From Swiss-Prot:
The lineage of its organism: Bacteria, Bacillati, Bacillota, Clostridia, Eubacteriales. PANTHER family: IRON-SULFUR PROTEIN NUBPL (PTHR42961:SF2). It comes from Clostridium perfringens (strain 13 / Type A). This is Iron-sulfur cluster carrier protein. Keywords: ATP-binding, Hydrolase, Iron, Iron-sulfur, Metal-binding, Nucleotide-binding. HAMAP family: Mrp_NBP35.
Amino acid sequence: MGSCASCANKDKCSSASKDGGCSSSVPAKLGTNYGNIKNVIGVISGKGGVGKSTVTGILATQLAKKGYKVGVLDADITGPSMPRFFGINEKRADIVAMDSEGKQVKFVPVKTELGIKVISMNLLMEVEDDPVIWRGPMVTGVLNQMFKDTDWEELDYLLIDMPPGTSDITLTVMQTFPIKELVIVSTPQDMVSMIVKKLVTMAHKMNVCVRGVVENMAYIECECGKKMRVFSKKSSEEHAEYLGLPLIGELPINLDLTEALENGKAEEYVAENPLYSLIFEGLY
């Protein structure tokens, strides 16, 4: 169950249930044409470069390990990175015409080693590093189509890797997607926390429940086992308290994970590392 009990805005948020958790009821919004999705979870950050996509990949991997049917929608249209995390960046999603004129299409997502279904702009383009040079309405229109027209089949969880900040995409997802709750990713700096707080305030104004915050790059672990906080003397709990959110967990700076990401082996590394199971244990 989600926990909004520590949120300063819980009395104003229609997503907060009487017992202090996020309401399980989700208002009818944008639907899917192919498949059924039980839970839609948004993963978001206030700024780029804090490891939001990495956290999305870690959470998706942990859910798949538990036996859940999981999908990932890479909503960062102009800066997609989920295919790289899962090592599927050389593959492409199939686009199937559903009528004779080709006006209605179906996207067939790419599956990872654990069976996670992924759709991303980079899986729909011929060349991975070609830029997407579109204005807001075009970007949001394509994102809506990726959500509606992907063949998700049956999913227990769809994780949406959202772009950072409070842009058009964020507004579109919060307004029109059937988001159950958000997981916010931050790093231990006051400047980052200040910007994240804007995002938290936006979520409350949009009546979107925030499950809590994951603090990434919280520390480096010495070979002796001591945790060294290199970016802030404040604890993760203090940063979470400033945001008015429960602390889901803290992730270290991990060079082995970085190397696995570079080699397209992050999913395998995360699945085998007990640290990530412990951090997200009990979240879903």
